[in-house]
Regions:
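C-terminal substrate-binding/catalytic lobe of Rossmann-fold NAD(P)-dependent dehydrogenases
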Residues: 2-57, 307-309, 313-446
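N-terminal Rossmann-like NAD(P) cofactor-binding subdomain of oxidoreductases
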Residues: 2-326, 334, 466-467, 474, ...
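Short beta-strand-to-loop capping motifs
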Residues: 166, 386-390, 452-454
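Short pre-catalytic strand/loop immediately N-terminal to key active-site residues, enriched for Gly-Thr
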Residues: 284-288, 447-452
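A generic structural signal for alpha-helix starts
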Residues: 295, 391-392, 458-459
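Glycine-rich phosphate/pyrophosphate-binding beta-alpha loops
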Residues: 373-377, 453-460
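Generic C-terminus detector
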Residues: 448-454, 463-483
Length: 483
């Protein structure tokens, strides 16, 4: 019987659904029980629907030109599940596509090829020790960090969210904070179950038992009283930004290290993961994760500087409003920021361009920067006007940045889009530090203008989690390694 085109399409779709459904329990088990995060060309598959798994495979076609069939990637997923692996992020798409279409196996069987590609985490004796984490503050970034840490919860969770610290509130405070975790106007509902234990001051979320501690100062807490020790304190309040202030956390019993989710002053290391994360030493007790804008632009600037050289440039950020601004006109100590955030474009300053030099010293003194706050609640854009050392063209520059996004050591920081229809809301929840909008790239000789989107909340929070892992000495490699 000859099938009609419609019947062929329906049969093909049902087959893809079938394989996606078979993949789901393997992906979930690998993540929960062994700490292995499966993705396809950077798109995470943990907790993904069958439709999301199918869509992730379309990404391969977009970037590589050839199809990766779900039945092909399913075979490789079964091999991964059969191996004794340490926690890692494994790109199933690159693994399968490399073997099937790029001859990366060099005559090896599929199993031997996978073993070779994953040998750095195969049959390793040493398992990472889990790190207790305390979120000091529970605002926009704090709640997104909580979502990310809860998402990673399981028997082999490397980062264990043990507590959040907030100022004392009135009756109903705990329910309100749990509700803010449960519902978010920008990022949508929490994916899971949240309950509150008022007697114990605990929020229970997807198997994570989160102690809520009420305190008025960072040096007044005994974390040992809650079974927490050697904790990494993630200060997301933005109140203390120097060594003296952040050092107060270390006076609390059970606290070991402090990470600030904002730019820091003085000699505190400003870390942009992917660029200078190896500067974090075991003896560093206080570190900062820089700003969302610095995280968005620095990886792209590093890649371009390494390949083309940068003489100088200007970075203009078109930034969503934040809760530092006023809802309606009122007094603010900063110029213009007192005007209604949701009604105005507000010209203001940013230290992001100068802060790049803290992570990338070779660009010190080469960049200027300014910012425009705009009436959108999330997702921002950096426009980088650069004078390069070498002449190039838009095609060459975009091809290079696509390769950076797919195959370089910055592939977890730099994303890439060639869509002519993408707008800011499409990028809410994007897990990369920045997304290069290739259709907007302008190049003439050695002058280049690049447009880089970034989710200034969620993408930044993902970078913060990576810095947390670095501070905890947790190895979580992305495999296969960059080509």
């Amino acid at each position: 019987m000859v099938l009609t085109p419609e019947q062929q399409y329906q049969q093909s779709w049902l087959e893809r659904q079938d394989y996606a459904e078979r993949m789901q329990p393997l992906i979930g088990s690998l993540y929960r029980n062994r700490g292995i995060e499966i993705c396809v060309y950077g798109r995470p598959l943990v907790s993904a629907s069958t439709i999301d798994i199918i869509k992730s495979h379309k990404t391969v076609t977009k970037y590589e030109g050839d199809k990766l069939r779900l039945r092909e990637s399913y075979e490789f997923l079964e091999i991964i599940a059969s191996l004794n692996l340490n926690p890692a992020k494994i790109d199933l798409g690159k693994l399968a596509f490399g073997y099937l279409y790029k001859d990366a196996g060099h005559g090896l069987s599929k199993t031997d090829y996978v073993k070779k590609a994953l040998e750095s985490v195969l049959d390793q004796e040493q398992k990472p020790e889990p790190q207790d984490v305390v979120l000091y503050g529970f605002g926009r970034i704090g709640r997104l960090l909580a979502r990310l840490l809860i998402e990673r919860n399981g028997p082999v969770a490397n980062l264990r969210l043990r507590a959040i610290v907030v100022r004392g509130g009135k009756d109903g405070d705990l329910e309100k904070r749990a509700s803010l975790l449960r519902r978010d106007s920008v990022h949508g509902p929490f994916n899971g179950s949240i309950t509150v234990d008022n007697e114990a001051n605990v929020i229970k979320a997807n198997g994570t038992y989160i102690q809520v501690i009420y305190a008025d100062s960072p040096d007044s807490i005994n974390y040992n009283d809650y079974g927490i020790d050697n904790a990494l304190i993630v200060d997301n309040t933005g109140i203390w930004k120097d060594e003296a202030g952040l050092g107060l956390h270390l006076k609390s019993k059970g606290a070991a290290k402090v990470l600030l989710t904002a730019p820091a002053g003085g000699d505190i290391k400003n870390i942009v993961y992917g660029v200078n994360h190896n500067d974090v030493e075991p003896t560093d007790n206080i570190v900062c994760a820089a700003s969302c804008t610095t995280n968005a632009i620095t990886p792209v600037l590093k890649a371009i500087n390494d390949e083309f050289g940068i003489n100088n440039g200007h970075v203009e950020t078109v930034h969503s409003y934040t809760n530092d601004q006023n809802l309606i006109d009122n007094f603010h100590k900063a110029e213009r920021r007192g005007r209604a955030a949701a009604l105005n474009m507000v010209l203001t300053s940013t230290g992001a361009a100068k802060a790049v030099a803290k992570a990338l010293p070779e660009l010190k003194g080469k960049l200027t920067g300014n910012a425009i706050r705009v009436p959108t609640p999330n997702v921002s854009m950096a426009i980088m006007n650069l004078n390069l050392e070498k002449n190039t063209n838009a095609t060459e520059l975009n091809d290079f940045l696509l390769d950076v996004a797919l195959h370089s050591d910055l592939r977890d920081q730099v994303d890439f889009t060639s869509s002519t229809e993408i707008v800011s809301t499409d990028l809410v929840g994007n897990r990369y530090a920045g997304v290069v909008d290739s259709r907007a790239t302008i190049v003439e000789d050695n002058r280049a203008v690049l447009y880089v989107w970034y989710d200034n909340e969620f993408g930044y929070s993902c970078q913060v989690v990576r810095v947390m892992q670095q501070m905890a000495g947790i190895e979580f490699p992305s495999l296969p390694f960059a080509e």
